Amino acid sequence: MTRIALVTAIAAAGLDDDLDPLLDACTRAGLIAQVRAWDDPTVAWGRFDAVVLRSPWDYTQRLDEFLAWCAAVSARTRLVNPLPVVRWNTDKHYLADLQARGVAVVPTRFVEPDTEPLPALQAFLSEHADAAEFVVKPAVGAGSRDAQRYARSQEFAAANHLARLLDSDRSALLQPYLSSVDEHGETALMYFAGGY
């Protein structure tokens, strides 16, 4: 039987509501699935035929450690997604790659740690004069951690937020806020075996 590890984090134990139904589905499919935390040093990852990233949600605060763990696991067994994809997807700079390949993405300005925050924000607001609201968030982030929505009138609060991110040596991004998120939410697409 195929053994798979469904990866979470010690700090995320019990927070992934989809794990129980996924475990049931794996059992029905004839798989032996176990939930394991990526940051549990007692796990023998080589015992699994595949290690599937599910909810290692603290990776954003421990990125170097997480990527080193991914590299170690991928040297022992199959990591899903593959290591190059994980590395690429952990940093929202991938949006620029997608855009360069013709994929429509939310207009994004990346701001790097050596940049003055207020002029960068003012240039962004000038480029997006029709945006009533905008978002400041870290390039490496999950959920809404350290992300904030601002009205144009909150330029200085947004610049301070941006400065805090940059001062902690984190790249950030600025995007117009899309009201469709309020109305329709966000949709994640999953691509398997050539289809969505």
Language-model-detected regions and their locations in the chain:
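Short acidic/polar capping segments at secondary-structure boundaries
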Residues: P84-V85, E112-E116, A139-G143, S153-E155, ...
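Structured catalytic cores of enzymes that bind and process phosphorylated ligands/cofactors
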Residues: T108-F110, L121-F124, A131-F134, A151-Q154
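Glycine-enriched alpha-helix->loop->beta-strand junction motifs that scaffold or abut catalytic
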Residues: G102-V103, D130, G195-Y196
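Phosphate-binding site of ATP-dependent enzymes
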Residues: R145, A151-Y196
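ATP-grasp fold ATP-binding core
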Residues: L98-Q99, L125-D146, D169-D182
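Short, surface-exposed amphipathic charged segments that create phosphate/polyanion-binding patches used
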Residues: D49, Y94-D97, L121-E127, T187-A193
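Structural motif
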Residues: A5, V52-R54, V135, L173
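Conserved N-proximal alpha/beta basic substrate-recognition cap immediately N-terminal to
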Residues: R3, I10-E116
